[in-house]
Amino acid sequence: MALALNVFKTVTQIAPTSPVGIFTASTGYTGVVLLAQAANVGSSTKKVSLSHVRTTAGIAVTTEIVKDLPIESSDTANLLAGKLVLETNDVLKLSADTATDIKFIGSILETLN
């Protein structure tokens, strides 16, 4: 069976207090993050972090995209200014300073290598 050339995915997650992988680029595909937004549904300002992790030769390198970005109550923040390319096995990680109030949504295009 032939592999799909392009696959669109939506990722949703309530941000935990410790970084968690919310998307890993599949083998044979490149992921293109088209949208990454976080909404604060709580009653006070909360902070969110989003990072890219690439492991090469067994060494994981974390690059922060946003770190401790404050989002006011009942507001939303775009976490990317443009697109982000994720190579095979790259991981997108998310965390916040609360485990209940930051809701993430992302749109990702996986394209066959």
How would you name each of these model-derived features?
Residues L5-V7, H52, I71, A81, ...:
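Generic detector of low-complexity/intrinsically disordered segments
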Residues T56-V91:
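Intrinsically disordered, low-complexity Pro/Gly/Ser/Thr-rich segments with frequent PxxP/GP/PP motifs
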Residues M1-G31, L35, T56, S95-N113:
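C-terminal interaction-tip segments
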Residues V41-S44, T55-A57:
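Acidic glycine-/aspartate-rich tracts in secreted/extracellular proteins
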Residues A38-S43, D97:
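Short solvent-exposed strand-capping/beta-turn motif centered on an Asx-Ser/Thr pair
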